[in-house]
Regions:
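A short SAM/SAH-binding and catalytic strip from SAM-dependent methyltransferases
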Residues: 158-171
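Conserved SAM-binding loop of SAM-dependent methyltransferases across substrates and taxa
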Residues: 82-95, 111-112
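A short acidic, Gly/Pro-enriched loop at the edge of an enzyme's catalytic core
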Residues: 147-160
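Conserved class I S-adenosyl-L-methionine
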Residues: 71-81, 99-102
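Class I SAM-dependent methyltransferase Rossmann-like catalytic core
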Residues: 2-71
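Conserved beta-strand signature within the Rossmann-like core of class I S-adenosyl-L-methionine
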Residues: 186-195
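S-adenosyl-L-methionine
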Residues: 115-150
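A short glycine-rich, Lys/Arg-flanked "PGG" loop and its adjoining helix->strand segment in the class I
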Residues: 173-185
Length: 229
């Protein structure tokens, strides 16, 4: 896997569970800003982080691929970070195209938790593009959209993926009007939430495929189909 130090830094911001115990202790003592500006810049092993990240994405793929058929599908990814999962999907399926919606900045003080309006961000879209291309995803197979540019995809999607992002860190309603434009009759969306029952009001079908009781959120991963307009 191609990964440089800048990309490894992004991975640690997006998936902080990959930070080793020693570095976690440093972050706890000196704070996130010091950790982001200095520790993650000089005291990390990009290769090791890349391998752990790839392993994590493979695990995620194994879970969702049991419930979703990606072949010949248009896939929308929201809040997917570096998009390692999309790489794994592409290696195992014949995808039509990925559309990726992400933010293009790193918050000055990264805060993890709930954010109603989706203001928090920790990404750099030029690095996402570099990561995908250098790891074998052809440029014509994906398009990246900056959430804050207000220019979002205007086509229908078969599958929408938003793991540990939509309704996990910010309100689902941020995207609701947009979804009503891009959902087809048989479109499916997969995401993590603590309020699975709520979505029976928005979709014809809501299926819980896994539960994560080991996190603060105690979230459930659900697949929804048939948006109610």
């Amino acid at each position: 896997m191609f990964i440089n130090r800048e990309i490894a830094q992004l991975i640690l911001l997006q998936r902080n569970e990959l930070t080793n115990p020693s570095l976690q202790k440093i972050r706890k003592i000196f704070g996130r800003r010091f950790f982001t500006k200095f520790v993650s810049k000089y005291l990390i092993s990009p290769k090791s982080i890349g391998n752990e990240y790839l392993s994590l994405m493979k695990d995620e793929y194994e879970i969702i691929s049991k419930f979703l058929d990606f072949d010949k599908k248009n896939v929308l990814s929201i809040g997917s970070g570096l998009c390692g999962l999309e790489l794994i999907i592409d290696r195992n399926h014949s995808i039509k195209k990925f559309s990726i919606i992400e933010k293009n900045y790193v918050s000055k003080k990264v805060v993890y938790g709930w954010d109603n309006k989706n203001y928090e961000a920790y990404n750099k879209l030029s690095l996402v593009e570099s990561f995908l291309i250098n790891n074998g995803l052809k440029k014509e197979k994906f398009e990246i959209f900056d959430f804050d540019s207000k220019k979002l995809p205007d086509k229908d999607f078969d599958i929408i993926i938003s793991l540990y992002s939509l309704d996990y860190h910010y309100d689902f309603d941020v995207y609701l009007d947009f979804f009503k434009k891009v959902f087809k009759k048989n479109s499916k969306i997969i995401f993590d939430t603590i309020r699975a029952d709520y979505f029976t009001n928005l979709f014809d079908s809501v299926k819980i495929i896994s539960s994560n009781e080991n996190t603060v959120h105690k979230s459930k991963r659900i697949i929804c189909e048939g948006i109610k307009l």
